[in-house]
Each structure stands twice: as structure tokens, then as C-alpha cells.
């Protein structure tokens, strides 16, 4: 297997077309029964000291699987002829769940039932092509190699396929396939600053122009700017759905219960995800166009962000900001762009050209020395300059 010095992992989702949908459900049910068995065994075996994942796998298999010596084991696996890699996938998932339970003090009782998606290790899948794959499935009586048709996504031109997961939802089956993709540039932010690469600083407005990008060169001079619009479209699309949701509540009731109007809540989530993906992709594409290898974002305090989101309207573009930031981080790394977060202190109160105090009026600013312009672009410039100054100070 080829090794990449720098890589990113992305997940491609495919819709599964398969005649025997009951086989998919039976395979998942068996997987979760085995998972629960090993979850309980792990908690009994390692109540205090927790070994590493590989060591836990070895010990749990020793306790449950008869070896070559044919000697009885303390806790034999209740199921017969379970494929090796199917069992190991369940053990690793059980180990992760048990460690999570032991690490938390808030969960009083261990989990009684699992509904995890099945992870197929090598040996449980084969013959993957653009639109088909073979999975080893349990039909209730025996294991069968089954050919599944896939729809809805493409195969990356480069990279390595990792273990797929079968995800069953209420009305469909999906196959989620992680791909390890090579990253062309894995240098640190300091190495890029030393090489005098351009930087792109971004501030979020929560308005129709939801993000403002500013390109600075190594000397701090502004080279370009980009205003990303679409916040009003997002708010309008959400408003249409929330109005229908409110009417449905009046007629059918249900309060805040998401299941009462599940299709409306799903549409809201889809709209949110669509615009977050769209805006983050525009920022990354702009960085690539301007050859900016560092993306500077304002640092967000989690508690403060929750206060702002609580105060914002339910259709406000402000609600997109956390999702855009999250997507920017992994999309930037995939493109060989490194993300740096800088504190926002004073970026909105001084002029980016002379450092004098400014007065704000709507979306514009005016400084004591007569400089004026868009205040969000001024903030983005100050944020980028603060990044450059910070690296320069630590280099001295």
C-alpha cells in the first residue's frame, strides 16, 4: 500500500441498490449483537486499567475464540462461523464505545443496545468499481457474497480506499467509503510565512455578504479582496420552510418535537448544509486562484459563539458561521492550504492603513486621518496583518 507523507481523509457517500434489503438489516443486527457482547466483556475485563486497541483486541479474542490447542475459553462467542474481520470490526467498535463510557462521568449505566453501522474490513468486501461492490452479508442462515449497485458519487482519481461502512436509514441504504487522498503541500504555517507566501484572511458578517476575504502579500500589502454574497438567499430559503413548519405545528401540534414534522426539519438541515458547503468552497477556490497558501480565520470562543447564536434569529446567516468554519478546515487541508486562527481583539476598532481609531457607520468606516472604506474589509485586512505581525514577533 502506497504511503503518503501528507494526506487527508474524505468520505464519499453512495446510495445502495440491492434486492435483498432484509440481508442488510440482518447483517447490521448481527453486527450490533456481537458488538454488545464484546462491549460488556470489555467492561468486565478492564474495569480500571485500559490497554491499547490492539492489545484489547488480542485479549478479547483470547477470551472468546478457541485457539489451535482446542482448549476451552472463559467466554466463548455464542455465534458460530463469524468471519474474522467482521468480528474484529465489531470488537474495535465495542472497544471505542467502552472506553468512551469509562471516560465519561455523566453516563450512569452502560449502553443496553447498539444500532451502529457495519464497518467492512478487507476480507468482507471486494471487487469495488465505479458503481458496484461485493459485500459479504448475513442472510439469517449463512454468509453470502452479494453484488451491490452504487449510485450518487464518483471515485477519486487518486488516493486509497479505506474500510466502507453500511449506513441504514429509515428509507434507504447508503455506503460511506473513506478515501485517503494525498495532500500536495504539508508545510507548517511558519514555513509558508518564511517563504513569503500570500495569505487570505476571512471575516464573517452574518449579513447578505456573509464573508469578506482579503489577500495580503508578505509585506502586508492588500493584493485583492472578495465579497461572498448569498446570506439573504439562505435566510429566504429557511424562512419559507419555517413558515410551513409553523403552520404545520398549528394544525398538527408537536411543539419542538423534531419527529412531528421531520420532513421540514430535514429540509432545513439540507439547506444549511448546502449553503455552508457552497460558501466554504467559494473561499477555498478563491485562495487557490490568488495562490494564497495560508487561510486566516478569526478565533471564536465557544461560549461567546453560543451566546451570539442564541441571540440570532433562527433564519439568520449567522447560524452558518460554525459550519462554514468547520468545513473550511478540512477543505483547506485537502488543497494544501493551512488554516491559522487569530484573536479578533481590536481588528474592528482601528484603521488598517494608519492604525488610527475609526468611526463606524453601517457597513463603512471613517478614520481620524480621513481613510474610509468597507469596515468588514478593514477587519479582514487587520486580521491578516495581525497574523503576519504575530509570526514576525516570534521569529525575532
Protein language model features and the residues they cover:
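Acidic carboxylate diad motif detector
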Residues: 54-172, 182-183
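Residue-level signal for secondary-structure boundary elements
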Residues: 32-50, 99-106, 253-256, 291-295, ...
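Gly/serine-rich nucleotide phosphate-binding loop at the start of the catalytic core
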Residues: 1-92
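Broad gene-expression machinery/nucleic-acid interaction feature
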Residues: 6, 130-134, 145, 172-176, ...
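Positively charged, helix-rich recognition surfaces that bind polyanionic ligands
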Residues: 175-396
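Generic structural motif
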Residues: 12-16, 123, 138-140, 153, ...
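Stable alpha-helical structural segments in soluble proteins, enriched in small hydrophobic residues
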Residues: 34, 89-101, 377-387
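Generic detection of short hydrophobic beta-strand segments and adjacent strand-loop junctions
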Residues: 2-18, 142-152, 226-230
